[in-house]
Regions:
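Long, compositionally biased intrinsically disordered regions
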Residues: 1, 32-33, 52
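Short, cationic-aromatic polyanion-contact patches
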Residues: 2-10, 23-25, 57-73
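Short amphipathic alpha-helical elements of helix-turn-helix/winged-helix folds
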Residues: 12-20
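Short acidic, hydrophobic short linear motifs in intrinsically disordered regions
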Residues: 20-33
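Proline- and acidic/polar-enriched loop/turn elements at helix boundaries
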Residues: 29, 42, 59-60
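Short amphipathic alpha-helical interaction segments
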Residues: 35-46
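A short, conserved structural fragment
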Residues: 48-58
Length: 73
């Protein structure tokens, strides 16, 4: 069940990011995507590692503040 919820929340994050053409604030993803707020940062990390998105701006300690879908060259 936990694995299924992780997949569902990751898909919610993907769907939310896909609804924008440009940058997306992580705070907006947390508030509006429907994903559990505790799963958003791990999902963003996995999506960055997979090449789906890029982090445009980070906090001082490295947490993403603004992300965008990676444009395929």
């Amino acid at each position: 069940m936990i694995q299924n919820q992780k997949i569902i929340d990751t898909q919610r994050v993907i769907n939310y990011i896909n609804s924008f053409l440009d940058n997306v604030r992580v705070e907006d993803i947390i508030q509006n995507s429907g994903a559990d707020k505790l799963r958003v940062y791990p999902a963003l990390f996995e999506l960055e590692q997979s090449g789906f998105l890029e982090v445009v701006e980070r906090e001082e300690l490295g947490a993403p503040l603004i992300v965008m879908k990676r444009k395929n060259g």
